[in-house]
Amino acid sequence: RHEVPQANLECDEGAMDLKISTGNMVALYQILSASKDSDCPAGGAVTWTDQVVAGLRICMGCPVELDLESEELKVPVAVSISKRRPPGWSPLRAAVTSFNEKEFSPPAPPSRAEYSLYFDMRK
């Protein structure tokens, strides 16, 4: 394994800012080894040295717990119920039903707004 030398970048480099703002230049940056995170104040001399540690991420398609009181879910749930309603279904009967279990849904890819809802409704 080859170690890449650590590059400490100043948060605010005045000479670079001047060149970019006055000479219509384009700045090109290359990430050599890893992402960095910093709490550099504007105009400060603190260097970017803190390693960004990736946390556990939810995979696309893995079930996630939903908030049953969420305003965001009212329309998808109503559409899902209306498409799968049993014979003899009426809006009045649907209004008095409630969810009995916490629901799970795979998170939708960013390019689509789609839910797979599984619910248990009882009077």
From Swiss-Prot:
GO terms for molecular function: cysteine-type endopeptidase inhibitor activity. One of its GO terms (biological process) is vasodilation. Keywords: Cleavage on pair of basic residues, Glycoprotein, Protease inhibitor, Thiol protease inhibitor, Vasoactive, Vasodilator. Bradykinin is released from kininogen by kallikrein. N-glycosylated. Contains sulfated N-acetylglucosamine and O-acetylated sialic acids as terminal elements on biantennary and triantennary N-glycans. It comes from the Eukaryota. Inhibits papain and ficin (cysteine proteinases) but not trypsin (a serine proteinase). This is Kininogen. It comes from Gadus morhua.
